[in-house]
């Protein structure tokens, strides 16, 4: 674990990403999260294992380019986003949707 997030692992994971592709990846026990853009793979692994009490087998991260946003004549950039696809050990699950 890097020193940037030492003791603040809850700040690493921002939210789960619920898309069609991410939902289909749940069948392979892969979960997609939006994470802090400064987080490294050891930070993400430690945060997921501690917050959800599961065992992480692998992590894939991607840093897509920032998108431009225009409002009237003003242009700006959207916030930096980093996505992490976390693969869990067999038998471990994360409850993303509440039971009805």
From Swiss-Prot:
Keyword RNA-binding set for record: yes
UniProt GO cellular component terms: ribonucleoprotein complex; ribosome
UniProt keyword terms in alphabetical order: Ribonucleoprotein, Ribosomal protein, RNA-binding, rRNA-binding
One MF annotation (Gene Ontology) recorded for this entry: rRNA binding
Superkingdom of source: Bacteria
A single BP term in Gene Ontology: translation
Protein's UniProt keywords contain Ribosomal protein: yes
InterPro entries listed in its UniProt record: Nucleotide-bd_a/b_plait_sf (IPR012677), Ribosomal_uL23-like (IPR013025), Ribosomal_uL23/eL15/eS24_sf (IPR012678), Ribosomal_uL23_CS (IPR001014)
Alphabetical list of Gene3D superfamilies matching this protein: 3.30.70.330
Family membership: Belongs to the universal ribosomal protein uL23 family.
Function comment: One of the early assembly proteins it binds 23S rRNA. One of the proteins that surrounds the polypeptide exit tunnel on the outside of the ribosome. Forms the main docking site for trigger factor binding to the ribosome.
Assembly and binders: Part of the 50S ribosomal subunit. Contacts protein L29, and trigger factor when it is bound to the ribosome.
Name recorded for this polypeptide: Large ribosomal subunit protein uL23
């Amino acid at each position: 674990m890097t020193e940037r997030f030492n003791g603040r692992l809850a700040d690493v994971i921002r939210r789960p990403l619920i898309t069609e592709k991410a939902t289909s990846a749940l069948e392979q026990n892969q979960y997609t999260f939006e994470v802090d853009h400064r987080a490294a793979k050891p930070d993400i692994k430690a945060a997921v294992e501690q917050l959800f009490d599961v065992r992480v087998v692998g992590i894939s991260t991607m840093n897509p380019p920032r998108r431009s946003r225009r409002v009237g004549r003003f242009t700006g950039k959207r916030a930096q986003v980093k996505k992490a696809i976390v693969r869990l050990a067999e038998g471990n699950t994360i409850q993303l949707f509440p039971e009805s």
